[in-house]
């Protein structure tokens, strides 16, 4: 049995719904096709989100990302479509998708798209003093 690409995103219940925490994912092998030339475009996607009630299931995300391999789409459009589909599936408190497309015609393209759940406000950051570097020997 072979695994096939799919546009269906699956989720699971967020195990810690009482706390804001960030989930960070890196997807280094995204591919789609240039809608003008049909040539492949390659990108590294970085996904950061703060879940609410649902988290994205990794295998379904992999198959979803894979589904773009043979689709012709502009960088801006595909980044926003992926973000929109993730928002529909998870309804996160916050989500940011960064697409860093590799050079094409001497130009690198980066697209950043974000969504915030209505009424959600991030907690203020906590800045802690850093400690001096520790060594396992004393002088």
From Swiss-Prot:
Catalytic activity: 7-aminomethyl-7-carbaguanine + 2 NADP(+) = 7-cyano-7-deazaguanine + 2 NADPH + 3 H(+)
Gene3D superfamilies named in the record: 3.30.1130.10
Active-site residues, Swiss-Prot/TrEMBL: 34, 41
Subcellular location: Cytoplasm
Major subcellular site: cytoplasm
E.C. code: 1.7.1.13
NCBIfam families in UniProt: QueF-II
Name by which UniProt lists this protein: NADPH-dependent 7-cyano-7-deazaguanine reductase
